[in-house]
Design a protein with these regions (language model features):
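A short beta-strand micro-motif
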Residues: 2-8
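Short, mixed-charge low-complexity intrinsically disordered segments
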Residues: 33-65
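Tryptophan-centered short beta-strand motifs
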Residues: 13-14, 51
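Acidic surface patches and DE-rich sequence motifs
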Residues: 8-9, 49
Length: 65
């Protein structure tokens, strides 16, 4: 399961969706990144580097840890 987050430089982390399968998470991330005019990435066990506005897909368990 995956969560889709929006990381905003000014406001921090906002959960856009949670508990999605891979394909649904990708669809939500694609749609939200286009709507917000920001990039998107899939975080697979690493930390977010440079702090910028981005839509992020993370494993649900990784976020809870």
């Amino acid at each position: 399961m995956y969560d889709v987050l929006f990381l905003d430089r000014s406001h921090g982390e906002q959960v856009l969706a949670s508990g999605l399968d891979h394909d649904d998470a990708c669809r939500v991330a694609r749609s939200e990144s286009e709507r917000r005019g920001v990039g998107r990435m899939f975080l697979a066990g690493s930390e977010v580097g440079e702090r910028r506005d981005v839509v992020l897909i993370v494993e649900s368990a990784a976020r809870a840890a």
